[in-house]
Structure formats: structure tokens, C-alpha cells
Amino acid sequence: MAKESYKRDKPHVNIGTIGHVDHGKTTLTAAITSVLAKQGLALQRDFGSIDKAPEERERGITISTAHVEYQTKKRHYAHIDCPGHADYIKNMITGAAQMDGAILVVAGTDGPMPQTREHILLARQVNVPALVVFLNKVDIADPELLELVELELRELLTEYNFPGDDIPIIKGSALKALDGDPEGEKAIMELMDAVDEFIPEPVRDVDKPFLMPVEDVFSISGRGTVGTGRIERGRIKINEEVEIVGIKPTRKSVVTGIEMFQKLLDEGQAGDNAGLLLRGVDKTELERGMVIAKPGSIKPHTKFKAEVYILRKEEGGRHTPFFNGYRPQFYFRTTDVTGSVTLPEGVEMVMPGDNLSVEVELIVPIAMDEGLRFAIREGGRTVGAGSVTKIIE
């Protein structure tokens, strides 16, 4: 079947749902598509098709990151349903990194829970610019409790440097909206209005040199290897030369095809989730953690100085200090790389809650510029965050 070309007649915004497990993120995602489908602005996606992660399906826990597409009158949205379960923070970090804004889903019956806090913190760490809150399950929650939940949420958002007093909190029931209840549907439209208004149209990095972090790799028989990911900056056209940078020695290739949402494009640009077909590249030569970039625009490095913040125990961080030579994983863009930490002279140890400058040496090179952000992780758990301040080699 010939793929239809993708139209660009509205601003494109990447958003997603975040929040505690079982608070209704996936139900809300399904409800948004169902309500907008009635206005011809979306294809309806049922809960099961969004929640497709077979090994965990029985327990009703969403693991994989589902991509859904819909429109409002003003915008075109690519929506990610982020996993809520603590074990899947790894996916959350790649997912949240793809957001221009997020809908924080909180059950009115529970109020903020540990993962609510964790996701707000992660949103702050990966620089999600704006949040809108959907207070779910209000049909079965105690009205007096809802007022307290709202106050608590605003305080929590403020604590992590989001504008807690100004963030819209929309009350509703995703399940009722999904069942076609008029009150339920009205809340979804209110939510989409709030998302249109409050989540700023992203300032795209289209004028910078092209760069796309590789999230996944496929091979198409007879055509070659496809790298998928979200284009971080710049534009890419068919037949342009690119470099594949990081982990292994840098190599050149040519982009022979670009597709987005299963539709072919002649050009991809910053903000697009795209698949790039690469000439002469074997599936084994491309892996998650590499970047595809404009030749000469970015170099791989192993040693750098960074400003880091080490999470407090209460934020889900370490319970104990670490010392010179500490070897955690550094999560850059889409992958973890082990590295060793050298503390500044005169610093014996680092306590949870500390903020300091360190030197890091990675075991494999990663494409980096100054200002690149990363998470510091141990066995899949985020224990800190940082930003590259100076490249050494």
C-alpha cells in the first residue's frame, strides 16, 4: 500500500501522560482519542491497543511507550503514554525526554503518590517545559478530599520549580469520557483547551545542525537499515550525507528515506519522531545511544566536567554517600554508559542532596556538546542529574 504524505498545516507538539501507576494515564489517552474522533480530529484508539505490552498485560501494567496521534482545532499532537510502574523508569526517561509538555494524571481518590513525585522530578530533570494536571476519578472521590488533593498538588509542583499556582488542574473521569458520558467528554475538551493554551508551542531547533539520537534500529529487507528517534535539532532531506557518532568509530552514510507516523516525508525536522533509512549501513553498525548528525557538527567524547545534583533519599536517591572513583551509569539521550567520577580536590565524599562539579570518564565515547543533560543511575534507578559544563577529550 502506498503511504500517504504527511501534512504540516498546524503547529506540531509532542506531549505525554505521566503519573502514578493505575491513576488512569492509559484510560485518559484512550478517552482523548475517543472524544476527538467524534470531531474528526483523531482515530479512536481503544485502551487495549495503547496498553500493548504483552508480558505485563495480565497485571494491567503498561510497560512500553505507546505513540498516539491526534489534533485539536489549533494543533497537531504526538502523544506518548508513559509507563507508570517504577521498574520502567528507564522508559520514562526516554519518553519524558520527548515531551514539549505533559499531562500529569492524578487519581482524586488517592491524591499524589510516590511515583507522582518521581515523575514530576523526572519532568523537571529532563526539562519538560510545562505540565497540565488532570485530576481523574472525581466521580468516585470525596469532594472535600479533592480540595485538599488540589492544594497538595500545587505545593508539590512548586517544590520542583513548576508554577504550581498557575498550572491548570482539570477535574474529570477518563472512564466516563471513554463511555461517552457528556460530563466526562466535556472535561476532556476542557483538558485539551488547557493543553492548547498552557503548553507553549515549542521553539524548534530547526536552524541548528541536524541531530537525531537513535532509539531503535530495524532492517528492511532489500532496502537497508532504519534508525528511529526524535529529531533533536535541524532538518534532514533525502540524499543528504550524515555521520553516525558515538560508541563505535564515527562513520558516514546517506539518508535514502524518511518516514513519520508510517507516512513518507521528503524532509524531517526538529521535533519529528522519524525513521531514517541509511545507505550501506548494516543493522549491527547502528545501535541505541548513537546519534545521526550533520557531518562535522558533533564529536564523540569520553572525558568531561559536569555540574551534578545527587538526589536525596526522600527523592528516591541513594541512602549513603559515594567516594572518589564512584562508577555509576550515565544516561545520555537514549542509553546508559558506565563512567567513573573524579571528585574535586579537597572533597572526600558526596552526600545525597549535594550539588557539585565533578569530572567524568566514560568507558565508551558519546556524542556530546557542552550543555548536554544526563541522568546518573544505578541499576536502573535515577540517583542524580547533571549537565556537561566542559569537554576535556
From Swiss-Prot:
Region feature G4, mapped onto this chain: 136-139
Would I find Cytoplasm among this entry's keywords? yes
Q: Which GO terms describe its molecular function?
A: GTP binding; GTPase activity; translation elongation factor activity
tr-type G domain: residues covered: 10-203
Q: Where is this region: G3?
A: 81-84
Q: Where is the protein found, in the record's own terms?
A: Cytoplasm
Q: Where is this region: G1?
A: 19-26
Q: Where does Mg(2+) bind?
A: T26
Q: What is one Pfam family matched by this protein?
A: GTP_EFTU_D3
Could you tell me which PROSITE patterns the record lists for this protein? G_TR_1 (PS00301), G_TR_2 (PS51722)
Keyword Magnesium found: yes
Region described as G2: spans on this chain: 60-64
Broadest EC class assigned to this enzyme: hydrolase
Q: Which InterPro entries match?
A: EF-Tu_GTP-bd, EF-Tu_GTPase, EFTu-like_2, EFTU_2, G_TR_CS, P-loop_NTPase, Small_GTP-bd, T_Tr_GTP-bd_dom
The free-text function statement in the UniProt record for this protein reads: GTP hydrolase that promotes the GTP-dependent binding of aminoacyl-tRNA to the A-site of ribosomes during protein biosynthesis.
Family to which this protein belongs? Belongs to the TRAFAC class translation factor GTPase superfamily. Classic translation factor GTPase family. EF-Tu/EF-1A subfamily.
HAMAP family for the chain: EF_Tu_B
What is this protein's name?
Answer: Elongation factor Tu
Q: Which organism is it from?
A: Chlorobium limicola (strain DSM 245 / NBRC 103803 / 6330)
